[in-house]
Amino acid sequence: KKGQKLNLKTYINEILKVAKGTPVSLEVTETTAAGMIKQGKALYKMFNKVAKNVYIKIPINPAFKNSDSTHFDGIIAIKALSKAKIPTNCTLIFTPEQALLAAKAGASFVSPFAGRVDDFIRVNNKIKVDKTAYYPSIGMTKSKKVLEDNGIYSGTDLVWRCVQILRNYNFKTQ
């Protein structure tokens, strides 16, 4: 049985209605500050009227390469959108310091990404990855001299440190 065809705008509207007051993040695809700001404002204007629950998802660092000049454009975009009273969800947070920068810029939410670094290392070293790599039935194990981290410990530590920073400085960011 085939599902009905919907256009993207209709589909997003339905998600927003079903979610009611729950925040829904809509992601920008631009990678420059100016592009993310323009796209973020357009998404917010187009969709927030549906259920007043739209947050614009902005990456902390939209650069694809070290040589790109857009490393801080996410922070610039968050600051501009926050000034325009548009709530944001800052994504691709890999360090507590990035969470601090996002909060200082006015992000409504920060979203730490704990597993991406592990995934990158595993893929580059041709290590087989499946869901048991992150959620083994026995959790963390202690080998002869080293406590092996299956990704959960480092991930929870990142989240804990981000929360501590936000609380210690009384940011409204969640």
Can you name each region flagged by the protein language model?
Residues 64, 72-79, 87-174:
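Catalytic alpha/beta core domains of metabolic enzymes, predominantly
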Residues 20-24, 50-54, 84-87, 106-108, ...:
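Short, well-ordered coil/turn segments that N-cap beta-strands
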Residues 1-74, 78-80:
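Active-site beta->alpha loop and helix N-cap motifs at the rims of alpha/beta catalytic domains
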